[in-house]
Curated annotation (Swiss-Prot):
InterPro entries documented for this protein: PCMT, SAM-dependent_MTases_sf
Similarity section: Belongs to the methyltransferase superfamily. L-isoaspartyl/D-aspartyl protein methyltransferase family.
Gene name of this polypeptide: pcm
The protein, known as: Protein-L-isoaspartate O-methyltransferase
EC number annotated for this UniProt entry: 2.1.1.77
Superkingdom of the source species: Bacteria
Localization annotation: Cytoplasm
Catalytic activity: [protein]-L-isoaspartate + S-adenosyl-L-methionine = [protein]-L-isoaspartate alpha-methyl ester + S-adenosyl-L-homocysteine
Gene3D superfamilies the record matches: Vaccinia Virus protein VP39
Protein's job: Catalyzes the methyl esterification of L-isoaspartyl residues in peptides and proteins that result from spontaneous decomposition of normal L-aspartyl and L-asparaginyl residues. It plays a role in the repair and/or degradation of damaged proteins.
Organism per entry: Paramagnetospirillum magneticum (strain ATCC 700264 / AMB-1)
Cited PANTHER family: PROTEIN-L-ISOASPARTATE O-METHYLTRANSFERASE (PTHR11579), PROTEIN-L-ISOASPARTATE(D-ASPARTATE) O-METHYLTRANSFERASE (PTHR11579:SF0)
GO biological process: methylation; protein modification process; protein repair
Any one GO molecular function term: protein-L-isoaspartate (D-aspartate) O-methyltransferase activity
Residues annotated as catalytic: 61
Length: 214
């Protein structure tokens, strides 16, 4: 592996200081070039710890949030993972370095086409995508060991809980879809129902039902 460039090293050091300590997650972030997922006008900010616009009124998440969500998900290398909200594909690419198989759902077809081209370029052959309503999950491929949702919902989508394996973990932002009062939560599916652990205030775009005409 070639040596990481200084701006990547600076970002990794910042993430570690801010709580991303899982070495597998840090390694995945190091190996995925965020610049490939950022729009050209923002390339100079590709390795800054900030969210950036990507089109279709969506964003590529702040690297700290990507790191903390990936860490909270506790992904094992033999696991099957569902991601809701492919977006630029950056979070999916990081997860793909951690799991055996990743399924990712995106409602915006133009974003999905761009993300799939990036996955092909990076030879991430363990990612399968489709354009669909993310709130419904991917029932044909269920159950999943882990589920990550990258858009905020006012309540936990029941379909996603149904598609989670027993003892499975889901990480998602919950709260006001206007982005004022949201919190990342980690949900564990137990034989008694679900255990909910909030762990970080955030601001995400809303989880929207249906597929837009584009």
């Amino acid at each position: 592996m070639k040596k990481a460039e200084p701006r990547v090293i600076r970002l990794l050091m910042e993430l570690r200081r801010m709580g991303v300590v899982d070495t597998r997650v840090l390694s995945a972030i190091e190996r995925i070039p965020r610049a490939l997922f950022v729009a050209e006008p923002f390339l100079d900010q590709a390795y800054e710890n900030t969210a950036l616009p990507i089109g279709c009124a969506q964003t590529i998440s702040q690297p700290l949030v990507v790191g903390l969500m990936s860490q909270a998900l506790e992904v094992g290398e033999r696991m099957k993972v569902l991601e809701i909200g492919t977006g630029s594909g950056y979070q999916a690419a990081v997860l793909a370095k951690l799991c055996r198989r990743l399924y990712s759902v995106e409602r915006h077809k133009p974003l999905l086409a761009e993300a799939e081209a990036r996955f092909k370029h990076l030879r991430l052959h363990n990612i399968t995508c489709r354009a669909a309503d993310g709130s419904r999950g991917w029932p044909e491929q269920a159950p999943f060991d882990r589920i990550m949702v990258t858009a905020a919902a006012p309540d936990i989508p029941p379909a996603l809980v149904d598609q989670l394996k027993p003892d499975g973990i889901m990480v998602l932002p919950l709260g006001d879809v206007g982005g004022i009062d949201q919190e990342l939560v980690r949900i564990t599916k137990t034989d008694r129902g679900i255990d909910i652990q909030p762990f970080l205030p955030v601001r995400f775009v809303p989880l929207v039902e249906g597929i837009p005409e584009e």
